[in-house]
Every structure is written in C-alpha cells, then in structure tokens.
Amino acid sequence: MYTVELGKLVEKMNLENCTPEIDISSIQITQPDVNRPALQLTGFFDYFDSDRVQIIGNVEHAYMQKMEKDHGLGIMKKLMSFKMPCIVFCRGIEVSEDFKEVAIEEGVPIFRTEKTTSSFMAEVIRWLKVELAPRISIHGVLVDVYGEGILIMGESGIGKSEAALELIKRGHRLVTDDLVEIKKVSDDTLIGTAPDITRHFIELRGIGIIDVKTLFGVESVKNTQSIDLVIKLEEWNRDKEYDRLGLEEQYIEFLGNRVVCHNIPIRPGRNLAVICESAAVNYRQKKMGYNAAQELYNRVTNNLLKKSK
C-alpha cells in the first residue's frame, strides 16, 4: 500500500492550519477518496470511512450550528475518536473554538480552505489518485510525440535512446530514459514519469550521459505523460511474420490496462524517429475515427465486388 504525507497535501492545496499545536509530520494518507461526515453528525457511525480525509462544507457546518452545545460536543468527540488523517473546512468557514479544543484533545489536525466544497473535493481526489496509484518500473524510453505518449521498449543496446534523441531534435519532448515509472491512475489511464535521480538525462553508448534540458532547452522535456502507444524494437527476423496492414491491433498489458503495441523490426537504414512520428499520427487518426488499413480493405473489397458483377 502506498501512502502520502499529510504535509505534502497541505502544501499542495495551500491549506490554512487551524491547529498548529498538532504535529502532522508522521501522519500519512492511505486512501485516495474523501468523505463528508454528514450522517456521522447525526450519530450514525456504521460504515464510517474514517481513514479518508474528512471534508466539512456549508451543509455540515449549518447542521453543527443548530446542535445544542452538549450534544454537539458529544458528537464532535465521537467523530474525532476515530483515527483520521485530518478534517478540512471549505468555503473559508470559521472553525469554532469548541471544535478546535476537541480536535487538539483527540490529535486530529484541522485545516481550512477558501475553495468551494465540490471543487476542493475534486481537486484533492484527482491529486491523491495519482499520488497513491499502483505503480511499476520498466526498462524503456518515454517520449511525447505530437501529444501522444510513446513508450519505446526493446533489448538493451537496440537503439531506444538514439531514437529518442532524434525525436527530441525534431521538436518532441523527453519524459524519461532507461527507467519508466508507470502509475495506474484509472482503468484506462497510465501515467509515466522519470525517477528523480535520472530526470532529463539520456545515456548514449560511446558518449555517456547528456542533460537534455541543458542541451536542448526546457521545451524539450516533460515531467509526466500518459502512455498511449508502445513501440517495441527488435532485431529483424527473416522467419517472423510482421504486421503489414494493421487491421488487428496488438496490445501489451501494464497493471491490468491494455495499451496498443507495435513490434518494429530493426534494419540498417530505417529511420526510427520518422516511424515513431508516423505511429503517433496514425494512432491519433484512429482515435478520431479514421483507420487507413480499414479504408484500404474497404476499397479492395468494393473493387472485387464490382468486378464480380
């Protein structure tokens, strides 16, 4: 299970700390979802998702304001007796002194934001989904080509980094070389990024390590990119049948998500950068509803039907 420090969330969302007396350095968030404790304020604590970040909006605050003081204090103590990362008040709602006292007593940090409840929840969930996403690391190169994330794979020394360097010279952007960290942020989205230690570097055999950001400028690099297409480079095999039409897509699976994969045989004289660019544009065309292979198939079929009449 992956975790993210509460302090990182506070910094990212620019939250105001209403209980600075509480040390948050050891508090970890483990759940990407959030919870609005509406039913819990009425005293119903069955199925309470206390391990999530708790959000208080106008509705919850208005209900607490109408409670009798003793009853309200009892509900607050019961609520914060559960182990939770924190409670966030949205819309700039003022936190009562009674609420702060109970929070400090129970060790539950309280924060505040000026953002609306729904927009804050959406922003937090989206960020936590990425931070807490399941992940793997694979050997390869990830490049942004015309907005499509191209993951170049293949055996060591086959030319992945050289292909990436040529793509960079042609105006495309490097995400990571050699090691790709892949996160599954949804059932149809994979995000690739570089380890901090190797970010923006490329290794070229015979030359060594080069800093792409320094050599080609900030426009030549990118920190993250969705993985839309995989290109697997392999040595040319005369006995192997390679796809020449592209009517049927081949796929590779990462973390349960399937990604379109093209096996590209390597021979002297083949321009890998142009092949990668063509694959990216063709993939985008297919997403927009046009399939060149299907169009050719339809033309041939129609031509044969005409001749048979």
UniProtKB/Swiss-Prot annotation:
It comes from the Bacteria. This is HPr kinase/phosphorylase. The keyword Magnesium applies. The active site is at residues 139, 160, 178, 244. The keyword Metal-binding applies. InterPro entries: HPr(Ser)_kin/Pase, Hpr_kin/Pase_C, Hpr_kin/Pase_Hpr_N, P-loop_NTPase, Ser_kin/Pase_Hpr-like_N_sf. Its EC number is 2.7.11.-, 2.7.4.-. ATP binds at residues 154-161. Pfam families: Hpr_kinase_C, Hpr_kinase_N. Residues 202-211 are annotated as: Important for the catalytic mechanism of both phosphorylation and dephosphorylation. Residues 265-270 are annotated as: Important for the catalytic mechanism of dephosphorylation. Belongs to the HPrK/P family. It catalyses: [HPr protein]-L-serine + ATP = [HPr protein]-O-phospho-L-serine + ADP + H(+); [HPr protein]-O-phospho-L-serine + phosphate + H(+) = [HPr protein]-L-serine + diphosphate. The gene is hprK. Its cofactor is Mg(2+). One of its GO terms (molecular function) is protein serine/threonine kinase activity.
